[in-house]
Amino acid sequence: MSLLTEVETYVLSIIPSGPLKAEIAQRLEDVFAGKNTDLEALMEWLKTRPILSPLTKGILGFVFTLTVPSERGLQRRRFVQNALNGNGDPNNMDRAVKLYRKLKREITFHGAKEIALSYSAGALASCMGLIYNRMGAVTTEVAFGLVCATCEQIADSQHRSHRQMVITTNPLIRHENRMVLASTTAKAMEQMAGSSEQAAEAMEVASQARQMVQAMRAIGTHPSSSAGLKSDLLENLQAYQKRMGVQMQRFK
């Protein structure tokens, strides 16, 4: 796996699924391929994205700044600086300085990542802030190692939280989660169907599914009534793909 592929993987792992994630993935691909060289426009686009947490925006801004060639005097962006200040906690800053001293002696991506993984996400973000504000200088490989370690820490906590929701025995939470997943799947079906004539059936199925979820929420239904909703939708989507000559069995 190449270095940039690894960085893209880690960064995307902390972004919630949805159309915005697909858009960010495309921007990262373009940046890493050298196709997007306007850092100013890229940062302005990032700043105005909804949903993303300030820290996620800070990490993406840091990655874009590391990758896109820019003029020496280009101003640092406040939204990135604020996100990478470790919540203003002096303990985070102290640890960040210690980490930075270790990273300065490191030259490899994996070496930097290993060192960084023993620190908290707050200290890692503060260390990124030091480098972003030009208060510290490390090689690009080492900076990317720091980015990936930070993303791994965040993804771990997101995974624990997600697992708690998945294994919860509360029927109301499970019911709502199934309806949310069904609704999201329906939206994805509508996007994939596009505007071809054959797409009418897939669009109809997706539209009916979304209406059903809205009705279930409006009238209040038994928690077991949502069981299988998402699976039914995916079966319809795969049947549609088969007719279109596309064989993809990886949605479940």
Curated annotation (Swiss-Prot):
Residues 1-164 are annotated as: Membrane-binding. Transmembrane segments: none annotated. This is Matrix protein 1. Residues 165-252 are annotated as: RNP-binding. InterPro entries: Flu_matrix_M1, Flu_matrix_M1_C, Flu_matrix_M1_N, Flu_matrix_M1_N_sub1, Flu_matrix_M1_N_sub2, INFV_M1. GO terms for biological process: viral budding from plasma membrane. One of its GO terms (cellular component) is host cell nucleus. Plays critical roles in virus replication, from virus entry and uncoating to assembly and budding of the virus particle. M1 binding to ribonucleocapsids (RNPs) in nucleus seems to inhibit viral transcription. Interaction of viral NEP with M1-RNP is thought to promote nuclear export of the complex, which is targeted to the virion assembly site at the apical plasma membrane in polarized epithelial cells. Interactions with NA and HA may bring M1, a non-raft-associated protein, into lipid rafts. Forms a continuous shell on the inner side of the lipid bilayer in virion, where it binds the RNP. It is found in: Virion membrane; Host nucleus. Most abundant protein in virion. When expressed alone can form virus-like particles in transfected cells. The gene is M. GO terms for molecular function: RNA binding; structural constituent of virion. It comes from Influenza A virus (strain A/Leningrad/134/1957 H2N2). The lineage of its organism: Viruses, Riboviria, Orthornavirae, Negarnaviricota, Polyploviricotina. Homodimer and homomultimer. Interacts with NEP. Binds ribonucleocapsid by both interacting with genomic RNA and NP protein. May interact with HA and NA. Cannot bind NP without genomic RNA. It is a peripheral membrane protein. Belongs to the influenza viruses Matrix protein M1 family. Its main location: virion.
